[in-house]
Amino acid sequence: HKEYRRQRQMCIRDSVSDPQSAPKLLVGTGKEDVHLCVVLTSDRGLCGGFNSNIIKKAKNYFEKIQKEGKSLKIITVGSKGYDQLKRQYGNSIIENISFKESKNINYFDAAKVGNLIIEKFQNEEFDFCTIFFNKFKNVISQIPQAQQIIPLENENKDKDEKLESNYEFEPDEDEILSNLLPKNISTQIFKAMLENSASEQGSRMTAMDNATRNAGDLVDKLTIQYNRSRQAAITKELIEIISGAESL
């Protein structure tokens, strides 16, 4: 839920007593040179414009980053995203993750992606991380989203909120944040994967419904065409029989 996520992020930010010593996962590296983009798509097709809408959103962001002279790295989650991006951005794709064997989306899959991102961040492989997915609105409408997850996006930045804490901690602040921040990233990824999964199912249901309706319309059209051809053939045979009888 958006409000829960906002409150959780506010809680994490409020837990920081000294912005200068805050974890980099929270405040960033201070640079914007390398951007990591995590693109969530499906492993299966036949779901309408679901995948192409995410790819279009991601490509627009890629072009913007590259025009600014910044480096781009991509992690694709789902084989369809990899298939559509590998030709143009193959050199930028550093990982392709698939969950074909998973029957249902679960937190452990999200944590696997989250741990990979955190490991690469700790190895100083990127400065910013943005995740791309479809937000579920209803079965006929899914909205492509781009959400920054590293550093933690400040949703109250327009209010010029200060990053400082008035709380007392037990255990200490560093221990709490060292556990909470990685879980927060995995939770955000899990939320995006759930939104994406619901959007995929809605898009696939709509696509299959349209395909069934179109197939029904085609069958009706072909049935009418067949009956007309059959009727014309019968009429022609009757005319030939009558003409032959008259000639006798």
Feature names for model-found ranges:
Residues R6-L248:
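C-terminal beta-strand-loop-alpha-helix "lid" module of Rossmann-like NAD(P)-dependent dehydrogenases
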